[in-house]
UniProtKB/Swiss-Prot annotation:
Pfam families: ALO, FAD_binding_4. This is D-arabinono-1,4-lactone oxidase. PROSITE patterns: FAD_PCMH (PS51387), OX2_COVAL_FAD (PS00862). It is found in: Mitochondrion membrane. InterPro entries: ALO_C (IPR007173), FAD-bd_PCMH (IPR016166), FAD-bd_PCMH-like_sf (IPR036318), FAD-bd_PCMH_sub1 (IPR016167), FAD-bd_PCMH_sub2 (IPR016169), FAD_lactone_oxidase-like (IPR010031), Oxid_FAD_bind_N (IPR006094), Oxy_OxRdtase_FAD_BS (IPR006093). GO terms for cellular component: mitochondrial membrane. The gene is ALO1. The keyword Flavoprotein applies. Residues 23-197 form the FAD-binding PCMH-type domain. It catalyses: D-arabinono-1,4-lactone + O2 = dehydro-D-arabinono-1,4-lactone + H2O2 + H(+). The modification Pros-8alpha-FAD histidine is found at H60. Its EC number is 1.1.3.37. It comes from the Eukaryota.
Length: 525
């Protein structure tokens, strides 16, 4: 297919804006291919024309990693189910789909067949390709990265080749592609291992901050799914714990900020505290917390709800936001949270900076067995994953020294802790983040942490590579980069990723926004 024919199927007046509204771009051409063959032709045209391609889905990464002035591709039209194979003896099925299919669409299709995705992150708007490309995870002592549910991938690499990948066929490329940052190839098809549909019976408790820390050793392994929302100014935590059940659904929990009125009031109060009177922030938190959750500690007697797996695992992310998420060993959690608590309190007293809430605290188990276990004794409500693969992505940001243990032996020593620092952008207006995020990153880094690839980590000019500006020339929210630390953290795995990237994309078709890759050590300047 000639370039003229390829370009004839593209738009030249398209503006891409990410969900948070922080970044936007106007690509030279915007493509929405209708087939894998069209993807191949677009890649070959890019090689011929010396262009780069970025693939985007829902745009939920709040960073600038997808910004480009060259070619942009969206796979929403690649949304077909290719094959559905049941393994009734071990209670799972392998579903093969085109990778532009959104997760919420896949969940609807699976529900019609009596199946569900095993574990999800906070949202379901991502595509099948996008959800694994930056290391999405849920919150569970038994489940790890969403990519561990993937049996195989089909990619179009930077040579225009259609390549099938799994644990046996090109396992090294598979490890790179299951967390690729969009730099290995375009994922066009995937097979995901799913399980019989289930509901989640959850208990939601209001507890004191100290209660969380005092029960740290046992809380995190007390349910299959668990997460906390920390409100530092009120010194309260909302503890959510859930397990699979076949019990019928109950009425959803009431949500003050889930109403149009509550949501508007909350966002308006944030706007006032950001733009007019920052010292109001702790009082806004207290008011909102009491409206949403009440005033009484309910540890051991929280409210119980039965939801679909999707409703239970997803959450309302509220407003446009900056997000800085880091992961570290769970055993370092109490020290980290006490340090952050002290810093947040001191900063408020000195009117240095104020944080928005909640600060989300989650865990995952990204340790992997040497081989896929026997699942013949599972039931529909058995805890834990049915692995699609047991290969760790080279760029997995979770701690590397943690060792696998069977579900019955899992302790905090197998688990990674994720802490999510969020600053809202009320009504689409920016809020200051640099002081808080820098302190947060220093604290997490000292605890053996690393940032989530897709989030708004800042880094520092001392760690960056490529075009480094004077500190005064950066916008408050602008990423400086972390090249030197990322090289140190990932070591041989990063070198292997680079080698595979060069092999699969020798023409640098997928090196759009090269500055982002350089300042974070993905490639050399």
């Amino acid at each position: 297919m000639s370039f003229d024919l390829v370009a004839g199927n593209a738009r030249s007046n398209f503006v891409f804006k990410n969900w948070a509204g922080i970044y936007s771009c106007r690509p030279q051409l915007y493509f929405q291919p209708n087939s894998i063959d069209e993807v191949v032709q677009i890649v070959k045209a890019a090689i011929e024309q010396g262009k780069t391609i970025v693939t985007v889905g829902s745009g939920h990464s709040p960073s600038d990693m997808c910004v480009t002035d060259q070619w942009l591709m969206n796979l929403d039209n690649l949304n077909s189910v290719v094959e559905f194979k049941e393994n009734k003896e071990e209670l799972y099925a392998d579903v093969t789909v085109e990778a532009g299919l959104r997760i919420y669409q896949l969940s609807e299709i699976l529900a019609e067949k009596g199946y569900a995705i095993q574990n999800l992150g906070s949202i379901s708007e991502q595509s099948v390709a996008g959800i694994i490309s930056t290391g999405t995870h849920g919150s569970s002592p038994y489940h790890g990265l969403v990519s561990s549910q993937y049996v195989n991938l089909t990619i179009v690499n930077g040579k225009g080749e259609v390549v099938f990948l799994d644990s046996e066929n090109s396992p090294e490329v598979f490890r790179a592609a299951t967390l690729s940052l969009g730099k290995i190839g375009i994922i066009v098809k995937a097979t995901i291992r799913v399980i019989p549909e289930f509901n989640i019976k959850s208990t939601q408790e209001v507890i004191h901050f100290e209660t969380l820390l005092n029960n740290w050793e046992t809380i995190w392994t007390s349910s299959e799914f668990i997460r906390c929302w920390w409100y530092p100014y009120t010194r309260k935590v909302v503890l959510w714990r859930g397990s699979k059940t076949e019990e019928p659904l109950t009425a959803p929990r009431k949500s003050w900020w889930g109403s149009t009125f509550g949501r508007f009031i909350y966002e308006s109060l944030i706007w006032i505290s950001v733009k007019i009177y920052p010292a109001l922030t702790p009082y806004v938190e207290s008011f909102v917390f009491h409206q949403q959750y009440g005033r009484v500690e309910t540890y051991g007697s929280g409210d119980v709800s039965v939801q679909t797996s999707i409703a239970g695992l997803n959450m309302d992310c509220l407003f446009s936001q900056f997000v800085d998420e880091w992961g570290c060993p769970l055993n370092n959690g109490p020290e980290v949270l006490r340090s952050l608590d002290y810093s947040i309190t001191q900063a408020a007293q000195n009117k240095e900076f104020f944080v928005h809430v909640p600060v989300e605290v989650r865990c995952s188990n990204t340790t992997l067995p040497a081989e896929i276990p026997d699942y013949s004794n599972r039931t529909k409500t058995s805890a834990g994953p049915v692995f699609g693969n047991t290969l760790r992505p080279y760029l997995d940001a979770t701690p590397r020294h943690l060792r696998y243990a069977p579900l019955s032996d899992v302790t905090n020593s197998q688990l990674s802790l994720y802490i999510n620092a969020t600053i809202y952008r009320p009504f689409g207006s920016n809020s200051p983040i640099h002081k808080w995020f820098t302190l947060f990153e220093d604290t997490m880094g000292a605890a053996g942490g690393k940032p989530h690839w897709a989030k708004n980590f800042l880094g520092a000019t001392s760690m960056a590579a490529g075009k480094v500006k004077d500190e005064k020339d950066y916008d408050d929210y602008e990423m400086r980069g972390m090249a030197t630390k990322i090289k140190e953290w990932y070591g041989e795995d990063l070198l292997k990723f680079r080698e595979i990237r060069s092999q699969q994309d020798p023409n640098n078709v997928f090196m759009a926004n090269k500055e982002w890759a350089i300042r974070n050590g993905i490639i050399e300047p």
